[in-house]
Each structure stands twice: as structure tokens, then as C-alpha cells.
Amino acid sequence: MSTKAVVFAYHDIGCVGLQALLDAGYEIAAVFTHADDPREKTFFGSVAQLCARHGIAVHAPEDPNHPLWVERIGKLAPDFIFSFYYRQLLGDSLLACAKKAALNLHGSLLPRYRGRAPANWVLVNGESETGVTLHQMVKRADAGPIVAQQRVSISATDTALTLHGKLRDAAADLLCETLPLLAAQGQLPATPQDESRATYFGRRTPADGLIDWSLPATQLYNLIRAVTQPYPGAFCPVGDNKLIVWAASVDTSSNGEAPGTVISHEPLRIACGEGSLVITAGQRGDNGLYLSGEQLAREFGLVAGSQMLDKAKRRSVRRTRVLILGVNGFIGNHLSERLLQDDRYEIYGMDIGSDAIERLRAKPNFHFIEGDISIHTEWIEYHIKKCDVVLPLVAIATPIEYTRNPLRVFELDFEENLKIVRYCVKYNKRVIFPSTSEVYGMCQDANFNEDTSNLIVGPINKQRWIYSVSKQLLDRVIWAYGQKGLQFTLFRPFNWMGPRLDRLDSARIGSSRAITQLILHLVEGTPIRLVDGGAQKRCFTDVVDGIEALARIIENRDGRCNGQIINIGNPDNEASIRQLGEELLRQFEAHPLRGHFPPFAGFREVESQSFYGKGYQDVSHRTPSIDNAKKLIGWTPGIELSETIGKTLDFFLREAMAEKADQC
């Protein structure tokens, strides 16, 4: 009885994988591939053509994870599902269609170089070895247990094309050895990946080929060979023109010249941060001829002493203008402080108060107006038109208000913010919108994933969900506008904490976050109230960690955050509200100001309805997946919960002491 397989494949490696399955006697039930993109230079073999030659059914669905395709694949009842350089992630329901295993062939020695374009990245980074890995597919990309690997050496003269040929041959050898064993045994031993060694690299774009002459010559040489033909090439501006470098060599000397200075034109040799680069081949502009380095020097008029500079770079660089509505709020004031530490930003902010930003108002690149977003619409529209990036941070985000003032929550959080989003559409401005972990509602996933987790809320009579659905609806509106060209990023904070989170006065009327309420009880000597026993778990994130992630989203290196949703939370800092209260108490008792406050009055368990009123409903856990944050902005949180609690407690105790001083 033959072994049945469904194959997802593209590129040369896809052809190699499919041919290896045929050679090993597998029955190919169906093949899924991609239609070639006319904008992409097609230098590789065609899976579709190979299928046609063998009479194999081939498909190119836009979404292979669509229930219709999953159902069809399930009916095929494959023993195995294989993925060979297929460019879309296969979901759990699709992978479950394989009776024995779902396996992927990845072009690196996992766990290193997970992600996109590993052959290019290993060259960029100057590696001397890579390889191919056959591994089990799991929900996370390239993270499943390893079935087989084959190593490939990288020579100093390898380019992306020659290395791809080596990887293609290695893949053929590995599959020739592995596939017959797999068919005979049904399973092969698999070794879990060592997560401590894992690295992830994202998609490369033509813009990544920009040459920075301040870097060492060896680093630039590695970039050039990583993106030379058939890829778009490494390039640099020369005056108003573009020089694409196809081939080069390294000279260890720079003759003492500044980076970017032409040392000679025969050969064309340019000083770098360390050493110099000899350009041996390239072209002028995207449609120019392939020329030698010496002819390029003549084409561009380069002589010894010339500077490889972009005219635009010679002019002063304008700071990025960032509009923050709700600048006095918890995120707004911390974000402003962080961006002002970087001289690349100019902040324009509006809020109805200014107590949290007084420390920033004297800074030359900080501009503040006191105002209400529902009233000062002309000022807002003008500044959206004027600025580059817009962050509408104004919202009611305290749970008691969801049941106490649901219409006000909807009016402010949805209606007023929708106006701002539409101004961003009108003036083609990038919007970075604060979604919320609340949108996941009662999702049952162990870790909430931005792209796959269902957003589940309670019945209409549970009004606490009005905040969640207001935010979710705006997320969906922004996403829809994004399909029509709006530049956006949605970020979802998971229980950020730190100084200036709230005010004790807000806690006194119940309109604050959980930790502020707990601290107020300690300050006033009243029992700490644990709603429904405090068993609910949350993942608490230090505001310093959170703001660093947000700053990277604003920076948006290589446009990686465009059109993305990014959870910003710390899954390692999960604690129940009771545990939060207990740690607060421990640090409170040890604090130098402890003697100024009443004795601890104990914990008291209360029902949620008596605390929040009718219409409240809670969730047991809220744990983020931060894979998107890791791969898109290279972010992982690092501050432990106990440190965050200590900083937050200290801030509020000092606020309480200041209140006492004012009353004297």
C-alpha cells in the first residue's frame, strides 16, 4: 500500500522535494503552490510545471487554511503533509489532516535562522556554515522537533545564488535518505529544538540592500554577495543617482580616508568604516547596463576624493513629527519621555490635563495644548495633516466604567477615535492605534495570537464588553482602511504597570486599574478587596518594556510593522490578582515609608457584582503570544514583576505622602 502525501511547495526546493517524494514511491494526492508574482524575478524551477508533467493535481489558493480547503484536504486522508519552501504558514486544523505527521523543509540549521530568506541572512551575517532541516510542523513557524539535518559549508566567495544551489543539493540528499525510511516506518525519531539557541529573521526587502559606508568593508562585502543577482542588489546613492553593486572585494586598508570617500577610480575603491571596498561590477540605476568598476567610475564621474553621498543626506534631516492625543495619560507621558531622548522626534500632544507631563514641557521638541478631542477638532485635524505619525491614546480604560458608563465608553473610545482615524485616511498619515488585550475576551487559547485567536465576548446584558467590542470594531475599521492604503499598526498592551499609572484620587472613586486600587487600600488601612477571590490571572508588563516596544513600532525599521497587529505583554510575569496583592503587601511592609501608614487591614473577598455592578463578567486568564513582537521589532520583555510592583508602589506611596503634606 502506497504512502499518501499532500504537498505544499514552491521554488527550486519545492521541485526537489516533490521529485524526491515521487522517486521514493509516495502517492501525491494534491500539490499546493503559488502563482508566480510578475514583480519578482523568477530564476527558479516551477512546481506547477513539474506537476503538469506528472499529471498531478495542483492548486494555488489565496488562503490554504480556509475551511473549504481544510475540508477537501481532510477528505484526501493523507498520511503525510509536506511543506517545501511554501510561503504561507499552515494552521493547526490543516496540519491535523495528516494521519502520521506534517513536515517542513527549512533552509537553515534550526533552531538558528528561523523565518524568511535564511540563505540571504546567513551571508549577510558572515556565517561559515548553514544547512537544511526537516522538522515537524507546529503552530509556531520553524519551531517543531527536528527529524533530520544536513550541513552545508559556506565559502568566502559564495553568493546567494551559489549557496542556494548547495542547499538544493543538500535537500535532495537529505530527502533521498529520509523519505524511504519515513514511508517504511511511519515515524522517525524527532528531537525538540533548543529554544535558547533560536534566532529569527524576517522578510528582506530591496531597501535592505542600502550600503552604509560607515560599516566595515567585510560586512558590506557580505551584504553585496547576499543580495547580488538574481536578487535586487546592494546599492548606494551617488548624488541624485543610484549605484547598484553586483560584485566587490575587500581591501584591508582605507588609506586613512573617511568612510564613503573614493580612494581610487582604477580600480574603483571606496573607504569604509574599517578597510575599503573594491567595486568590480555594478550598474547605474535599475535599468542600467552591467559595467565594470572602472567604467562605473567614469559613468558617475568619480575620482579620488569624491564622496559617495546622497544629496538628500547633506541636508539637515527633519525630525519625525509624532502626534499623541492623550499625551498626559499613562502611555502618552512615558512614550513622550522615551521619544524625546532620541533627537529624531518632535512631539505634539493634547490632553485635558498636564500633571504627568510637567517634567517634559520645557523640552524644545515637546509641544502641548490643553484640550478635549471631542471639542478641539480643528486643532486635531490641522496637526494630523502636519504630523507624520498619529497615536490616538484617548480612551476610558478602567473596568468599573464599562458597567457604570457604557455609553460614554462607546462615545469616547469608538466614535471620537473613529473621527481621528478618518482624518488619518484623509491626509494619508500613519496611525498607530492602541487596541487592547480586552479584545480577546473569553478566548480559550492558552496564548492569545494576534492573527489566529478568536475574539469572544459575552451576551449583550454583560455591558462590561462594550469597551472590548468598541476597540475591536475600530481594529476592524482600521484594518479595512488598510486594505485601501492606510498605513497602520495595531498594538495590544497586556496590563502595563509602572509609575504614573493612575492617581490615588481615581482609585478612591473606583476608576483605576487593579494595582492602584490595591495600593489605595494599603495607604488608607482598609481591607484589600479581592473580586471573586482574586483568582483571575493576568500577565503584567513593566511600562519601560512596553514603551520600548512601542518606540520600535514608531521607528518601523524597514516597514516591518506596516499592517501588523502586535501584542505587547510579558507572558513570564503571569500572576493572579491575589498574588499581586500578596507581593504588594510584602514590599509595602519592607518599604522605608511604611511607618507613615495604618496597619494592614487584611484581605476581603467580594463578589464582582457588588464591586463592579450588574453587567460585569471576568475571564480567568489573559496570556499573550509575543511571537510577532519578537520577529517584527526584535522585542522581548526583561523586567520581572517584583521590580515593577516595587517601582509602582514607591510612586504611589510618595504621592500619598505629598497629599498628606498638602493637607498640613
Swiss-Prot record:
Binding of NAD(+), residues: D351, D372, I373
Subunit note: Homohexamer, formed by a dimer of trimers.
Residues that, per the record, bind (6R)-10-formyltetrahydrofolate: R116, V138, K139, R140, A141, D142
Catalyzed reaction equations: UDP-alpha-D-glucuronate + NAD(+) = UDP-beta-L-threo-pentopyranos-4-ulose + CO2 + NADH; UDP-4-amino-4-deoxy-beta-L-arabinose + (6R)-10-formyltetrahydrofolate = UDP-4-deoxy-4-formamido-beta-L-arabinose + (6S)-5,6,7,8-tetrahydrofolate + H(+)
Pathway linked to the protein: Nucleotide-sugar biosynthesis; UDP-4-deoxy-4-formamido-beta-L-arabinose biosynthesis; UDP-4-deoxy-4-formamido-beta-L-arabinose from UDP-alpha-D-glucuronate: step 1/3; Nucleotide-sugar biosynthesis; UDP-4-deoxy-4-formamido-beta-L-arabinose biosynthesis; UDP-4-deoxy-4-formamido-beta-L-arabinose from UDP-alpha-D-glucuronate: step 3/3; Bacterial outer membrane biogenesis; lipopolysaccharide biosynthesis
UniProtKB keywords: Antibiotic resistance, Lipid A biosynthesis, Lipid biosynthesis, Lipid metabolism, Lipopolysaccharide biosynthesis, Multifunctional enzyme, NAD, Oxidoreductase, Transferase
Protein name: Bifunctional polymyxin resistance protein ArnA
Region entry Dehydrogenase ArnADH, spans: 318-664
CDD domains: Arna_FMT_C, Arna_like_SDR_e
Function description: Bifunctional enzyme that catalyzes the oxidative decarboxylation of UDP-glucuronic acid (UDP-GlcUA) to UDP-4-keto-arabinose (UDP-Ara4O) and the addition of a formyl group to UDP-4-amino-4-deoxy-L-arabinose (UDP-L-Ara4N) to form UDP-L-4-formamido-arabinose (UDP-L-Ara4FN). The modified arabinose is attached to lipid A and is required for resistance to polymyxin and cationic antimicrobial peptides.
Signal peptide (from-to): none
GO biological process entries: lipid A biosynthetic process; lipopolysaccharide biosynthetic process; response to antibiotic
GO cellular component: membrane
Active site: H106 (proton donor), E438 (proton acceptor), R622 (proton donor)
Taxon lineage: Bacteria, Pseudomonadati, Pseudomonadota, Gammaproteobacteria, Pseudomonadales
EC number: 2.1.2.13, 1.1.1.305
Gene Ontology MF terms: carboxy-lyase activity; UDP-4-amino-4-deoxy-L-arabinose formyltransferase activity; UDP-glucuronate dehydrogenase activity
Site (Raises pKa of active site His): D142
Family annotation (Pfam families): Epimerase, Formyl_trans_C, Formyl_trans_N
